[in-house]
Amino acid sequence: IPGFFEPFKGADVYRAEDIPPLDVLLITHDHYDHLDYPTIAAIRSRVKRVVCPLGVGAHFEAWGYDPERITETVWYESVRLAPNLELTCLPSQHFSGRTMTMNTTLWAGFMFDIAGYKLYLSGDGGYGPHFKAVRDMCGRIDFAVLEDGQYNKEWSDIHLMPADWKLALTDIAPAVVMPCHNAKYALSRHVWTEPLTAALDNARSVRIPVTTPLIGSRIALADPAAAGKIWWPEKP
């Protein structure tokens, strides 16, 4: 986001041309760090289908995407993407908006049910009762992608502080967790490695395996924790 929020040094080596063809492009909300116009435009011919919260599809239509390829969802709505793949839109405690708009589109987390294998994407958001509600609604969660970066006490309602990340992790109790939202854009004042280190410590303290793969690497769902290792420096 030129002039406002820049990537951490070295975090922009993965570019649009590196993104492979996508069966489904899933967007959690329309903030610039999640919905980047140059990237979305560059991969348009490689995206078979877009799934996003209510209202976000208008951006894609304005940027030349076929409306027939766009599926908008609301909280607790499920969409079957394939015979053995169902996606459910779930609440998060966040907000939405771009330059001239605020909260005119929905924000969300999502649960993938892949033939009984449950993969949870929290989306952006602060701590709230929705985490336990997700667990109660969906049962066992095999893999969770849980946001853990760009936090600050001044906006703890919309991003998880490390202590709240641990609470959320305990609520959803996944078999394996992958922290995200931590090492791309400098939206807060912490050093870029701090969220990763805190997540690793917090996950270990509650005995939940944590995986921290490098961008672009593949994760085997049969053994997702195998992809994790400490690749960041102790002192950035």
Model-predicted segments: where are they?
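Conserved beta-strand hairpin/beta-sheet module of binuclear metal-dependent hydrolase folds
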Residues: I1-D12, N103-G123
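Short, basic/aromatic-enriched C-terminal tail that caps enzymatic domains
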Residues: S217-P236
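Pre-active-site segment of Zn-dependent metallo-hydrolases
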Residues: I1-D30, Y37-A42, C52-G55, G97, ...
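Cap/insert and terminal regions of metallo-dependent hydrolase folds
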Residues: V24, R49, G55-A58, K118, ...
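Short, surface-exposed connector motifs at secondary-structure boundaries
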Residues: T39-R46, D113-L119
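Metallo-beta-lactamase
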Residues: C52-Y117, A198-G216, A222-D223
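Metal-dependent catalytic neighborhoods of phosphoester/phosphodiester hydrolases
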Residues: Y37-R44, L187-T197, D223
